[in-house]
């Protein structure tokens, strides 16, 4: 069993996403393609603000990362990271075909069985010293 404190490679997740579904992992890599998202609404009607997506890239592969932002608090906030920054990410993995939710440009979506969405949902982002 891998503890959340020991970084793993992104390739390990890509190769066997089902074994990581809803597990917390620690990854290290470089931030790519930070994209702030428009506010979105949860099914309960609550609006969420400050969400963004990015890719985390390590020497083995890359993974889509979602930062959900704050719900119920109308704020305008820039992402906490920038393109090219090295970070350590603690995240919960959402793997495809489990009917789980994932964050997209259209807000929160339910992953259908045929969608190959593997997403890391950020729990904690720590900048690494260069």
Feature names for model-found ranges:
Residues 2-4:
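Sec/Tat signal peptide C-region and signal peptidase I cleavage site
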């Amino acid at each position: 069993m891998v503890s959340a404190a020991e970084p793993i490679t992104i390739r390990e997740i890509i190769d066997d996403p089902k074994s990581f579904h809803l597990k917390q992992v620690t990854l290290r890599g470089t931030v790519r393609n930070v994209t702030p998202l428009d506010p979105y609404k949860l099914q309960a009607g609550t609006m969420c603000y400050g969400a963004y997506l990015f890719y985390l890239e390590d020497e083995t592969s890359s993974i889509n990362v979602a930062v959900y932002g704050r719900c119920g608090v109308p704020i305008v906030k820039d992402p906490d990271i920038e393109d090219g920054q090295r970070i350590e990410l603690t995240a919960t993995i959402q793997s495809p075909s489990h009917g789980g939710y994932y964050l997209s440009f259209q807000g929160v979506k339910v992953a259908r069985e045929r969608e190959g969405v593997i997403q890391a949902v950020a729990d904690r982002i720590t900048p690494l010293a260069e």
